[in-house]
């Protein structure tokens, strides 16, 4: 049982990574002038979409929380709507936190918001898929001794790593790299 | 006894740090050796005949004089573009109209009409661009080094050979008027002098008008050979308004008129020199080495033609020190001994009508004299010290011998000289430039041994802090022996070192003495620590900092090693602080202290969750965290840009209100500032009232009630005066200036008296004696006259009964003198922190006054932020009742980080041009006269205000969790169902012990204070260690003098201020503790009586 779970975990993560790689290459087939550095905003949107889609598909296919009861269609719809609201809420609250952390308030608001969206994609979406719109369960998973299954364990690790990675990404900002994107930010 | 030993131990650790800092500084910030040799007329700089044309002429020294008189007009901070001609040859483009452009039109006219008489140069200034260093360079021709930058206030007489000295020894009459810095630099050198005070940068006109009063009469009287006029108006205008203010145009036009007037009065044997000593930044400051600061204007004019060619389109760039040898030779004087400038050869060519060959020869002879002088200087200097690099020196000597031989050969065989002359000139110039470059590089050379020693000492001190902070809370920490042995050994080492030096008759170096004492006291401590404690424990316990905190600390330290990060530190610090805050919140959640356990325990698993229930709900900690982030972000709006980042714009809110133009906005801002002041006051009073200390009848609380509002009133009134002083009608000027002198002094005096009161009677409690005392008060409204109704009877009869009861009880107690007298003392639970908060508020008000008005908002945020942080930290620190008490590392780190963040948000930057010099005038609008320590103190207090406040407030980190205990208890004791029980319970049990828990375990209390002090010193210490390491590793970095050295100096001074503040804060807690003890003793005695 456990080995099986670990195998499935591995495949899901590989798929996620693969989808990110795909999001770099596929759009260049359809879009002109697409590159990560030049049109980074578009890429962020696409990447976020890809990862969300992969997460959803995997959730539907793998169904790690098999114990959940069967429910009616209206239940599912309200659940889905709730998930959407949660996702938006997390985007906005991340945006607020970024601004509190020092992102400019008015300039570059779109960039900041897209950053919030991509971070939400890597943190909130897996939580929503795995735990559903259930804040108490989230709080449980992200506290000591709160993890009950290997899926939750993986969720904990990936989510915390996403936050730490986003945090680390802020560190090289002051370095004086003469990159075009940095010049743009400076302007 | 133990109190004293805690303080002494901390002082000893501070001494170790100071010794390390001093040793490192002495190796890092080397001063140039100042040679006292002098050039003289009789002694030519080198072998060989005296140069061409000087033989047989009277008054000629090394060279025949070309001008008998010089007028030197020094316009302080005359940037090059202020004097640059504005060409209007592009007709379509409208000329850029900035207040400082094109105002010196007489220069342009002269350059166009008399191209062979005048020349404009862009003179390249060596940093530091402070006036005194520039004056030194402009008279000695040398290179004042970095360390001199600090002594701008206390200028001293120049000991090196200089132009003024040469002039006076040649019997020339030097008349000076202007900036009184010259008085200190050249005491008694002038035949006639008119000095005007230079320090008051707000005064644009006194110096200039004073000069103008004397300039033309002196010139017409003819009793002078060299006339120096040093105008300050432009510089002061830059400091006060910046170059973009209309006032600058006025000032420059005035200077233009001065130049015009001088040109009209010049005689044929006189040279006019108009020079700026340095430039200014776009804010009007100077001191650093940005392009705008180091480019100054230099303009030469002679009524006779001296230049062989017309001026080039773009003015030539020359080093500023070139003026020194040029002027010396033009006036027929020896070049000052230590000069490293290169003569401006153009001026020696002899006018437009001279022969090309003879003019080139004249140039070569001037250059050769100059080269001989520089070579002699290098020879003497390298014999005196080992500063100069031997290899380069050797190369230069070879170059010089070759050039000199060529020159001699040229003199002897005039045939074919025309071809070789240019090469000789080029060789001589090459030598002079090489020598100058070598000197510039070598005078920034370091003593690596001292730097390594200082760094090692700093590292060792940090290690001691870490070790002792772990050891201090373990039982049986041997205070006295541990302290006495190292101190004794230190003294022994110092005496031995001094004796050794005495026997071999070397000069005693205080820095080395301190280092020896530090090392010899450090080693026995380490040995004792190892023997007594360390060997029993695994090494892992020595490094107790938790992982995430360690990571954040490492990032903080890594910041010091990159110039980009040091420049961006103002933004990186709030980011790190925010990370700390979120880390604290997340950690609280992770530890399960935020949520009720039923949410966390899985019913399926059935495990019992956390042993101690959460003390707060999750929303509470989250609110604190978000509030803190918001405060940090808001404080970040008061951001001053470092000069390196051109795209960044400093916050306009940092400037004083007086510089604002709009009346309405000014009034609004003034209102906001006063509101911030009132809010600060109200917050402190509210806090004191919440814990009840405000009710105490003790003098400090009376002061808080009445003195603090008075201080706020004084501050507000001073701001009103300062922001509107320029608009005051002339009749009120005297009154306004008087009031702006008295008010800040009154506020500072009030604060000092408040602190004195606090030290005198720090125990702010309200004592109510007698058990029945509260009940006697329950007698209700008095009733007079006979009762008329049943209701009246119902009311009166119990009253009478109660009254009689009281009477009897009172009589009984009086007869039974041994009866138990109970005393109810209130607010004992917050007695320590009440004293701390009062002291911090009293400290904050004078510091607030030293800043610009709108910084008061930052001070309000500072108090709010530290309040929230203390609450957040207290939520995570469990109160262990019997002790030992500890303050966790994250608390101390966050506190230190917040101090740094506040340093930046109060508008400071760790560079010298960013120092708020205005602070020196608060309370002293007329300047200080000759006093130097007071302005230095005021400016220092302004710069390191946040370091001081946070260091003094450091003990609050220990006290706060005990304060918060009352909240937790109150909340828990009022569940809805148990209200009846709570009422039944006697009042005494309900009262939480709070800070009295600390008093119950004094041993642990002192150990915790010591540990807190050591931890704070450790955090500050590793910062200074990182700065020292960065400065020593990157000592050849391009940015070392611009970024790393100033950063190190600011960190070092900040460390000293912080450590003193920390000692004061802990001493205050000790004083309160002593007072509480004596209060208890008195109470005990009273009870026994």
Swiss-Prot record, chain B:
Phenotype for residue 130 to N: Found in a patient with epileptic encephalopathy; likely pathogenic; decrease in mannose-ethanolamine phosphotransferase activity; decreased protein expression
Effect of residue 1047 to E: In HPMRS2; decrease in mannose-ethanolamine phosphotransferase activity; increased protein expression
One MF term in the entry's GO annotations: mannose-ethanolamine phosphotransferase activity
Subcellular location: Endoplasmic reticulum membrane
UniProt pathway annotation: Glycolipid biosynthesis; glycosylphosphatidylinositol-anchor biosynthesis
Complexes and interactors: Part of the ethanolamine phosphate transferase 3 complex composed by PIGO and PIGF. PIGF is required to stabilize PIGO.
Name listed for the protein in its UniProt record: GPI ethanolamine phosphate transferase 3, catalytic subunit
Source organism of this protein record: Homo sapiens (Human)
